[in-house]
């Protein structure tokens, strides 16, 4: 779990630079991660050629980009005008900023190799876009994931073969994320709740493949833990 906290910009460096925003990241060190369950999930839902790219440790890079994304883009003045839809749109915007910026850092700054980029992309898709259940309106992060899954699928960035295994066109991810980020920011800039609602209704659809993915995950279940009984 990674979270970011904005700090006051009253230190010497921030003042000298004209007032920059600083983020502090908090990462949960002890994490519950079921390696065996993920292997089963990959065998059921992901093309074997992609297994080597799914790496749980790569999610931290996406998370940092996501938290940075909250510090950029339209301000609260615009976001608040979207009413009850603002949280879904904002979480989704942060996701797309992360993926789009990672692509730019790889292309222009050579911060990531092609293999590293594939690991980040594949891990993001499998770890966050493979939902366990249909999200509800009060779950903005999961609603955002559903939006992104459908957008990638409709734009042929991801697809499933006759064996119901995921395939990814890595070359299309960066541009798709950039286009979706542009569209999302336009929704925020519109200051119109109806635009946000229409955007969510358009993309947050619980379709055939989302249902299949959720069914498989429910079938696989979760890792059983040792039951500890304490007698006083």
Language-model region placement:
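Contiguous, non-catalytic segments that form substrate-binding/exosite surfaces or channel walls
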Residues: 1-47, 55
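Second-shell residues forming the walls of enzyme active-site clefts
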Residues: 46-50, 93
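Active-site recognition of the HExxH zinc-binding catalytic motif
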Residues: 58-75, 94, 99
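An active-site-proximal "capping" alpha-helix that borders the catalytic cofactor pocket
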Residues: 87-104
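Non-catalytic terminal regions of proteins
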Residues: 1-14, 167-232
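Active-site-adjacent bridging/hinge elements
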Residues: 34-43, 66-77
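Long, well-structured alpha-helical subdomains associated
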Residues: 56, 99-202
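Post-HEXXH active-site segment of zinc metalloproteases
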Residues: 74-92
